Amino acid sequence: IANAAIDYERAHAGRFVMGYEEAIGFSVGPLVRDKDGVSAAVIFAELAAWNRARGRSVLDHLDDVYRRVGLFVTEQVSLTRPGSDGLAQIRDAMTRFRAAPPAALAGHAVETVVDLARGTGGLPPSDVLVFKLAGGRRVIMRPSGTEPKLKNYYEVRIEVAPGEPLADARARGQAELAALRDAHQQLLA
């Protein structure tokens, strides 16, 4: 993350704000070029102190964020396919989804397919497919770089209705996520 931030700042005369990787690495700001949580922990401690001074908890703050921007429900599912046959199956799945992406998943139209194999936004090419569905849902597919696995990431954004308990919104999100995951997994079978 830090190297990409430095390269971006040099190439675009921009300012690095935050970076994130799927393996839960965060880097916040340019002062500490660390992706393993040191700078993020400091920012989190500052957030906790700010909320405590107002008689609130970090969870209260998070609830406010959910109500303002929506509740995000995510899941990662890895399909392990050992051996050379397994690697061929993973390559075949990526090729098949590139050539004929689904028009819809779980009743939600696939609005955009982003194929990162060509590189995008100044990033180098990567064997990743991103399916952007109606309503802010996403499915991301990529082979593992170190194991015989096809990694699949599922994301659903749920609007929280005024006065709706967050537990109810979360349950709706989990149900939508399960339907999205199951529909995609059936296409991989």
Where are the regions a protein language model picked out?
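Phosphate-binding and adjacent anionic-ligand microenvironments
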Residues: I1-R142, K151-Y153, V160-A189
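A generic beta-sheet turn/junction motif
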Residues: G145-E147
